[in-house]
Amino acid sequence: MILNDDVKLIPGSKVEAVIKISKEFVKGKYNEILQDYSSRLKIKGFRIGKVPFSIIEGKYSDNIRALTIEKLIHKSLEEFFKSATYKPLGYAVPKILDEKLEIDFNKDFEFTVVYEAYPEFEIPDISNVEVEIPEVTVSDSDVEDELKLLQLENAMVVDDSGDVKVGSIVRVDFVELDDSLSEILTTKRQDFVFTVGESNNYYGFDNDIIGMKKDEEKIIEKNYSADYKFSELANSFKRLKIIIKDIKKRDIPELDDDFAKDIKDSFNTLEELKAHIRENMLRLVKEKRESLKLSKLLSDVSEKLNIEIPSAMFEAELKNVVNEFSTQNKIDLKKLNDSSMGLEGVSDVFKENVLKKLKSKLVFQKIVDNDLTEITDADLEDELVKQAEDTKMRLSEIKKFYQEKNLLGILKDEIKRQKVKDKILKNVKEIKLKEIAFRDFINYKTGE
């Protein structure tokens, strides 16, 4: 079908291709559509399928030619992309540059398409890249801290007949009052639940309600400093009416052998639980160390390269990041857009980081593509066995899932990516920094 294609790279990580289709194929596709029209058209005086082509062409020529061009472009692009050196991104639709395409049965059909592709660049030698990683040890106090967190997670929330204290879980109604002590209805909030002393409530009235009892009402006055955490309230005065509707407390379990058994039947003693916690913490340290090493290496390599990120790829990733931010912080995108920064302002905050992450992703993908490691059936079988063990499923069920969903190819790609990652981590040079605490290490980011 395609006689030839003239391909060239253009700025913006884009590809321009001039595709030429044989006139014989064009004529054949046109006749095919014409025949389809003939088999379906109802024209007075003719049986279906017996309408002369000349009559159909006289009445529907423009439609048939337009549909022929549409089919030619779709079919030829499908064929072109299968063998294209520069694969198109899935983020954007290829654009046909020709403003008006016409069919001339005496000439080959030609059109120009522009599409965004993965950027072209070469990976430099990464054997001498050095990565700085802080030292970390898991101490007994670290284990105790994690145990206390587990203790809090398993606390029961029960009614508290006493007054409000730091740590109380309260349900309140509150509203701003004007100078005449009338309620400003737009500020009214009902059944607001928070933990006293641990919340980030807008008005910051945690300390003002300490000592209050259930069903008690109180009017408080607040003067907010210039550096208050919510700029809308900075340098302002507010009068609030607060009603305590409910008070609860956490019934924290004792740290003993029974607590360990409640966490998991296989634990007989508290010491066994502590050993399990330490093992998990050491695993987290190992995973974090590997993640930091790979992230730092990819970042260092990408900074040395001039990688032109396709605009469609960048916009898609930026949109995902903003949506994730909105979801995590439970902020509706419309409200985000109506905020003082606006949606565009919020997006600007993430742009630099998104750009860096995309460059690192592209560098890693290029390393994977360049790697000659082949994934064998044995590698695939080992991974399926591991997944069956981890999920407590039968191996046959795991295999059936991947086969029915047509995911074995994707799984092979993931296995290769992990093998390449392991190879990189094995060879990277690590420079150890000063020791930091476990929790600080888990929250540590490269460049800190």
Swiss-Prot record:
Keyword Cell membrane: no
Catalytic function, reaction form: [protein]-peptidylproline (omega=180) = [protein]-peptidylproline (omega=0)
Any one annotated GO CC term: cytoplasm
Pfam families found in the cross-reference section: Trigger_C, Trigger_N
Keyword terms of this UniProt record: Cell cycle, Cell division, Chaperone, Cytoplasm, Isomerase, Rotamase
The EC number(s) this enzyme carries: 5.2.1.8
Membrane-crossing residue ranges in chain numbering: none
GO annotation (BP), single: protein transport
Protease among keywords: no
InterPro entries: PPIase_dom_sf, Trig_fac, Trigger_fac_C, Trigger_fac_C_sf, Trigger_fac_ribosome-bd_bac, Trigger_fac_ribosome-bd_sf, Trigger_fact/SurA_dom_sf
Main subcellular location: cytoplasm
Highest taxon of source: Bacteria
One of the record's GO molecular function terms: peptidyl-prolyl cis-trans isomerase activity
Places the protein is found: Cytoplasm
Occurrences of domain PPIase FKBP-type (ranges): 167-253
Record note on domains: Consists of 3 domains; the N-terminus binds the ribosome, the middle domain has PPIase activity, while the C-terminus has intrinsic chaperone activity on its own.
Job description of the protein: Involved in protein export. Acts as a chaperone by maintaining the newly synthesized protein in an open conformation. Functions as a peptidyl-prolyl cis-trans isomerase.
UniProt similarity note: Belongs to the FKBP-type PPIase family. Tig subfamily.
Protein name in the entry: Trigger factor
Name of the gene encoding the protein in the UniProt record: tig
